[in-house]
Amino acid sequence: MSYQEAWNPVDSSLDEIISIAASLKSKTGAVKEIFSQELTQREANVKKVHENLEELQKKLDHTSFAHKEDRDRLEAQIAQKEQEQKAKLAEYDQKVQNEFDARERAEREREAARGDAAAEKQRLASLLKDLEDDASGYNRLRPSKPMLSEEDTNILRQLFLSSAVSGSGKFSFQDLKQVLAKYADTIPEGPLKKLFVMVENDTKGRMSYITLVAVANDLAALVADFRKIDTNSNGTLSRKEFREHFVRLGFDKKSVQDALFRYADEDESDDVGFSEYVHLGLCLLVLRILYAFADFDKSGQLSKEEVQKVLEDAHIPESARKKFEHQFSVVDVDDSKSLSYQEFVMLVLLMFHDD
């Protein structure tokens, strides 16, 4: 076998190997291309995934921010509701406290009213007792028994219950004048006003039903007394009739009787008419009330200081007060430095003489 013949199979194998190698190289390039494309695609996919993740993170961040705003808004609403609820609770507590305070005030006012009513009842009882008591050596101006009839008392009670008293439960000065007009056509307003101020029960110028009945009874008594004293029924009182009446009332000193007559005889006619008598009676009733209030120890005597104090409280004119020292010594004939009711009346008459 020649060399060529022996080499041919080898060449054929080499060609086949070269062909296979070329084929492998071609396939390797294709595989590499495929791998390169897959790698590129994978990188693109990874990039896309990253982009998606970033987008998702942005969405998550936005959602978290939105949730925070919602949470803050919700917390603010809750805080506002809590404040409103606290305010309502505080308002309710204040309302309850105000109602409680109002009830306490009302209870205190009721207690005070009950105390005032009891004190007023005691004051009136003491006053009426003083007016009726003859233990000090003088009598009151009115008779011992009530002068108001049952019908008159019912009229006063109806007036008290009616709206004519302005719903206050007490009488004004005009109410008093209206009631007393039943007993006399003309009642001097000056002394009546003084009497009203002395016995009014509050600072608003009103008197209670009990006080009105007492005052009306006194006025009715004055009318009845005048008719009884006027023995000849001529409508006036002579000096003799006047003096005899006041002796019965305990004014036994002639000087006092004469002073009373001069005071009552305003027109200097030497007799005392009905209106003059009522005027005097009202003035004496005012003085009797002043004296009774000042005589705290019920001794029937007022010291000089007590007399001066009661006259100051009565707001007498300055011109009359200037006469006090001199006239007190004139009236206090026994130099006891105190005055009985009769001497007290005489003192006032002298102080107001020519005023």
From Swiss-Prot:
Disulfide bonds: none annotated. This protein has four EF-hand homolog domains inferred to bind calcium. The keyword Metal-binding applies. Ca(2+) 1 binds at D230, N232, N234, T236, E241. Ca(2+) 3 binds at D295, D297, S299, Q301, E306. InterPro entries: EF-hand-dom_pair, EF_Hand_1_Ca_BS, EF_hand_dom. It comes from the Eukaryota. Residues 151-186, 217-252, 282-317, 319-354 form the EF-hand domain. Ca(2+) 2 binds at D265, D267, S269, D271, E276. It holds the Pfam family EF-hand_5. GO terms for molecular function: calcium ion binding. Keywords: Calcium, Metal-binding, Repeat. Ca(2+) 4 binds at D332, D334, S336, S338, E343. This is Plasmodial-specific protein LAV1-2.
